[in-house]
Design a protein with these regions (language model features):
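Extracellular adhesion/carbohydrate-binding repeat motifs centered on closely spaced tryptophans
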Residues: 1-86
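Residue-level recognition of short, solvent-exposed, well-ordered loop/turn junctions
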Residues: 14, 34, 106, 125-128, ...
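Short acidic, glycine/serine/threonine-rich helix-capping segments at coil-helix boundaries
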Residues: 53, 94-155, 228, 276
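Acidic, Ser/Thr/Pro/Gly-enriched interdomain connector segments
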Residues: 72-120, 164-177
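Cysteine-nucleophile amide-bond enzymes
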Residues: 109, 128-140, 147-151, 155-170, ...
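N-terminal capping segments
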Residues: 158-224, 267-272, 283-285
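Catalytic cysteine-centered active-site loop
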Residues: 193-258, 303-306
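Aromatic- and glycine-rich peptidoglycan recognition patches
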Residues: 234-235, 241-252, 265-315
Length: 315
């Protein structure tokens, strides 16, 4: 294949019938090609890159519009995997009344309010301690931790520390690999401390749904509009949002499988979520002073308080 000057063309070349790939010696490539971490399929006869589904060797393959092989595609109507979790831009939580999460914990630690069973929530003691700090630092004594107050505290953490998001798998990952990544992320957090409204990383702790949300990210699932920032809001309950998320499959509890999300109710309202491992075991984190860990599926709630259906994020 030559360009208009007569020079040999190599790499990806777009011709009238589609994209082709030429080796360094000018030979046209056919069959499977790995480029930049992604796999592509080029018709062995024509050399044209495939974007339509392919049946080959008794296996079904799906491709993105870019031609990259997609190792798993959810059934129609369900959340599809992604290789990039939606960016948060400048979104981060200013610590006003009722706000929760890792930034609250960091300030509590900085001001001597934190202990293992302390709720990481902006309360009266928090506001009082912050107001006193602001007076000492020559700042306006609002009791609200904004960027200026945060910087003056010199916590060692960036103002956007609550933007942490787990890194997803590439699109080539299979369903099995995604299920194991979901479980594996949560498993790797066992031993981390509990932080109300927390979504990691390990040294800053998680609550139940913060752990599950990051595990979903690791598996390549981004259930927008749920985000780690909203997770810290006073009246936002990520466990309830995940249970009600319209693009997740629900199946009966009796049909539970490894990688499903188990939900629990208190007074008829969803208040807890865990990840199912199989054999009636889960991985979760549930309250202050108790680290992320493996546990029995009932998780002190009892069978009667488990919802009758589970969420299968990877159907």
């Amino acid at each position: 294949c030559m360009d208009s000057s007569g020079a040999m063309r190599t790499g990806w070349v777009r011709l009238a019938d589609g994209w082709h790939y030429f080796a360094s010696n000018g030979a046209q490539i056919g069959g499977w090609l790995k480029d930049g971490g992604d796999w592509y399929y080029l018709d062995p006869n024509t050399g044209v890159m495939r974007t339509e589904p392919l049946e080959l060797g008794g296996r079904h393959y799906e491709f993105n519009a870019s031609g990259a092989w997609r190792g798993y595609e959810a059934p129609a109507g369900y959340l599809q995997p992604t290789d990039h979790i939606t960016g948060l831009g400048g979104d981060t939580n200013t610590l006003t009344w009722g706000m929760n999460g890792v930034k609250v914990r960091i300030v509590q630690q900085r001001l001597g309010l934190w202990h293992a069973t302390k709720l990481a929530s902006v309360d009266a003691a928090f506001v009082s301690a912050v107001t006193n700090f602001q007076r000492r630092a020559g700042l306006s004594p609002t009791g609200v931790v904004d960027r200026a107050t945060w910087d003056a505290m010199d916590t060692g953490y960036p103002w956007t520390v609550d933007q942490y998001q787990a890194t997803p798998l590439p699109l080539t990952a299979t369903r099995h690999e995604r299920i194991e990544a979901l479980i594996g992320y949560a498993w790797n957090q066992t031993g981390s401390s509990y932080t109300w409204g927390g979504a990691g990383p390990y040294d800053l702790g998680f609550d139940c749904s913060g752990l599950v949300l990051q595990s979903l990210y690791a598996a390549g699932l981004d259930p927008q509009p749920i985000t780690v920032i909203k997770h810290g809001w006073p009246d936002y309950r990520t466990s309830q949002e995940l249970y009600a998320y319209p693009y997740f499959q629900h199946v009966p509890l009796a049909a539970r499988q490894r990688g499903d999300l188990i939900f629990y109710r208190s007074g008829g309202i969803v208040t807890h979520v865990s990840i199912y491992l199989g054999d009636d075991m889960i991985v979760h984190t549930d309250w202050m002073g108790r680290p992320a860990r493996m546990d029995h599926i009932t998780a002190s709630y009892g069978w009667a308080n488990i919802t009758p259906d589970v969420v299968r994020p990877l159907p």
